[in-house]
Amino acid sequence: MSDNCFCRQAVTNDAFALSDLLTQLGYPDTADFMVSKLNAIANDAAAVCWVAEINQQVVGFLSLHIIPQLALAGDFARISYFCIDETARSHGVGKALLQQAEAYAREQRCDRMEVHCHQRRVDAHRFYVREGFAESPKYFIKML
């Protein structure tokens, strides 16, 4: 299936498809603000969002942010959202999006990439390890 996979930058017309994918991840009701979020990413030089299409249908997306580091020579890239349609998983779509993100991060002079993944997403954990990610033991969050 990955031979038919085409990656491109997301546009506002992708809002409905991305909302559907986020619902699969457990984030319902994103349709009302998805267009404004995609516009914000499009206008942020440190952010990008790609979609993966098969037969002109969006089957996945990945959003990435470049984060400058003061104490290190290289910056790092953070995957903020990464979702593949349940019907398209294990067919190379995620790998294609990740390769797109890695190439872009290298162009931006990043020397590492990170992703936060909920502990219940065991299949995603296996994917990340297979793609060369190492588990990082601590992550703290404070709601504002």
Which residues make up each language-model segment?
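Short beta-strand-to-coil "C-cap" segments at the C-terminal boundary of structured domains/repeats
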Residues: D3, I141-L144
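Acetyl-CoA-dependent GNAT
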Residues: Q9-G74, S80, M143
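Conserved functional loop/turn residues at catalytic and ligand-binding sites
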Residues: A45, C83, G92, R109, ...
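Residue-level recognition of the GNAT/N-acetyltransferase active site
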Residues: I67, D85, H118
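Conserved acetyl-CoA binding element of GNAT-fold acetyltransferases
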Residues: G74-E86, K138
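Conserved acetyl-CoA-binding loop-helix of GNAT-fold acetyltransferases
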Residues: Y81, S90-A103, R130
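Conserved active-site alpha-helix within GNAT-family acetyltransferase domains
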Residues: K95, Q119-P137, K142
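Conserved GNAT acetyl-CoA-binding A-motif
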Residues: L98, A105-C117
